[in-house]
Amino acid sequence: MAIKKNGFIPSCDPEELKKVLKAVASEWGDMIKDMEEFDVVPLKGALTNEVFQINWPTKHGDLHQKVLVRVYGEGVEVFFNRDDEIRTFECMSKHGQGPRLLGRFPDGRIEEFIHARTLSAADLRDPEISSLIAAKLREFHNLDMPGPKDVLLWKRLRTWLSLSKKFCSPEAAKEFGLDILGDEISILEKELSQGYQEIGFCHNDLQYGNIMMDEETRVITLISNYA
């Protein structure tokens, strides 16, 4: 097992994670007797979380299983409700959008490992790839998600603005114009709420690090934490 200097995986409860990993392996018929059988590979691309590829030998010993462990970034809960995020993730998985949820532990979750490449900023300028992303995003927007169909945008913006004012220095608040953002949010809400408004399910964080593509099939997968 690849040990990092702070333990099994930093920033999380290693015993809880090992327990869940062993349970996942057991469901697939693999009996893990020694924790050294887990191989931990840090992955790049995530901005607010730490992600790791975890490998272990199958019961036949000639192949390896792979899962992705996502350790939540410190303090990101101020941006969204974690329970709501997990429910959304599970529902998206059932609709075939994104990886399957395999397990949870206090500091993160275990996901199906997607054999695809995380895109780069340069990829987004490729017309073919942009078209594939647009088609996938249309599927995403058309998902029939459970729960009330309420507009969350304005409440979220005001919450984030309040947090920004709380943690920013007076100099930073002035530089970013925080004092006028509240009025601008109200203007946008008024202008965009007139007439019939169709409420849809939105990604809210469509940057290249949250988009993956299978190089062979050209299938696009969207990773979402803020939908």
Model regions: which residues?
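Juxta-kinase regulatory segment immediately upstream of eukaryotic protein kinase catalytic domains
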Residues: 1-41
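Short, solvent-exposed secondary-structure boundary motifs
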Residues: 31-32, 89-93, 203
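ATP-binding pocket architecture of kinase catalytic cores
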Residues: 41-183, 187, 191-198, 216-217
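Catalytic-loop of the protein kinase fold
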Residues: 201-203, 208
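Activation of the activation-loop gatekeeper triad in protein kinase-fold domains
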Residues: 223-227
